[in-house]
Every structure is written in structure tokens, then in C-alpha cells.
């Protein structure tokens, strides 16, 4: 059938969801943004300002406004330079594929799964998207700092819950540290240590 743009997009989102025949498609929509805010005395005290970024998506039609019933989202804050004359940066990020299920408990296992296409949005069993998978939440913090012109130290912390719609589900607590040697602008070597505590009854 004709797959020309933009007709196929309108056809997929104006028609009823989950149809059969030549309208049997996996319907997804996403929007993302990045906002750069310059340094403002007393308000944004960071020398290089900061960045706010985010992404929101929905499975099977944007069925409810302003927030779809099957929505998932990611939001973050990035500070490229925390202190004047220093290379310390900071990233704080939160992602949620469980938001729709919490609002509508009957909508479980929506993200990265699909009933007509039983493999879902996956490759070899892994989701083509956020590693927390469906019905999950993820909180992530990372900072890096150059010790020399070619040696960079990094550390991160991660709290994650997967498949929260199940009676018992996996919880992960993770802390990591890494060291990167920039041999050249195109070649780098990295070593690190990660500690994880998994609760998966």
C-alpha cells in the first residue's frame, strides 16, 4: 500500500487504533526538546548556563489531551560547567515508562510490547529504547571532571525499578566510577568499576 509521507502519518493517527488489514500498524508518536539557558547572575549561576531536555511519547494513538493515556517520558538537567575555571559537569535525569499504568492500571505492559507484532519494539529480547523496559522508572545522576588535559574522571548513581506492574518486580541500586584516557580526539581508553545491588525476588 502507499506509504508516502505525510499521508501515512495522518492515516495512522486519524483512523481507529489497532485495525487489521492494510491499516495494521504499530502506532507511536514522540516529541523531544532541548532548552539552553545562559548564565544569569543570581538565577543561573553556572558559567556555561544549563540545559533542560526531555522527550515524551505515546503508544497506540495520542488518545488523551494534554497527556496521553499511554505516555512515557524522560526529562533531564545538564550543567556543562558547575564552577568557573573548572571542568566539573553534572547531569540529572529521570525516565518513566510506568506513568500510564499508574494513571490507568488496565494499561499494563504497553511500552516496547505490541499484540499484532509479538516481538514488540525489541531486538533479541532487549527493548529498542530505554534499558528499564516497560512499566519502569529510572533516576540517574552523573558527573565528570578532567584531572589533566587527557584524563577524565567520572562517577554516576542510578536507581531503577523494572516491570512495576507485577506483584513483585526488580529494583536496582547502582554506583559507578570510571577513568577515561583521551589518547587522541578520536581514540580513548576507559576503565571503570560498577557496584550493583539488585532485588529481584
Where are these regions (language model features)?
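Signature for the C-terminal beta-barrel architecture of outer-membrane proteins
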Residues: 1-117, 134-146, 153-176, 197
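Compositionally biased, low-complexity repeat tracts
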Residues: 116, 125, 129, 182-184, ...
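Extracellular/periplasm-exposed beta-strand and loop segments of Gram-negative cell-envelope proteins
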Residues: 125-132, 176, 194
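Short glycine/proline-enriched coil/turn segments at helix->beta-strand junctions
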Residues: 147-149, 185
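Predominantly the C-terminal beta-signal and adjacent terminal strand-loop region
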Residues: 176-201
Amino acid at each position: 500500500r502507499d506509504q508516502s509521507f505525510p499521508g501515512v502519518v495522518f492515516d495512522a493517527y486519524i483512523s481507529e487504533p489497532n485495525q487489521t488489514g492494510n491499516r495494521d500498524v504499530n502506532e507511536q508518536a514522540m516529541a523531544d526538546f532541548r532548552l539552553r539557558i545562559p548564565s544569569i547572575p543570581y538565577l543561573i549561576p553556572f558559567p556555561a548556563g544549563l540545559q533542560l531536555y526531555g522527550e515524551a511519547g505515546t503508544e497506540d494513538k495520542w488518545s488523551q489531551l494534554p497527556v496521553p493515556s499511554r505516555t512515557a517520558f524522560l526529562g533531564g538537567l545538564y550543567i556543562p560547567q558547575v564552577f568557573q575555571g573548572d571542568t566539573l559537569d553534572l547531569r540529572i535525569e529521570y525516565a518513566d515508562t510506568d506513568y500510564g499504568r499508574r494513571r490507568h492500571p488496565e494499561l499494563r505492559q504497553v511500552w516496547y510490547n505490541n499484540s499484532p507484532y509479538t516481538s514488540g519494539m525489541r531486538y533479541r529480547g532487549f527493548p529498542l529504547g530505554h534499558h528499564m523496559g516497560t512499566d519502569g522508572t529510572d533516576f540517574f545522576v552523573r558527573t565528570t571532571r578532567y584531572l589533566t588535559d587527557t584524563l577524565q574522571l567520572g562517577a554516576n548513581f542510578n536507581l531503577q525499578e523494572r516491570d512495576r506492574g507485577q506483584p513483585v518486580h526488580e529494583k536496582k541500586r547502582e554506583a559507578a566510577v570510571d577513568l577515561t584516557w583521551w589518547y587522541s580526539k578520536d581514540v580513548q581508553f576507559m576503565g571503570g568499576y560498577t557496584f550493583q545491588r539488585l532485588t529481584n525476588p
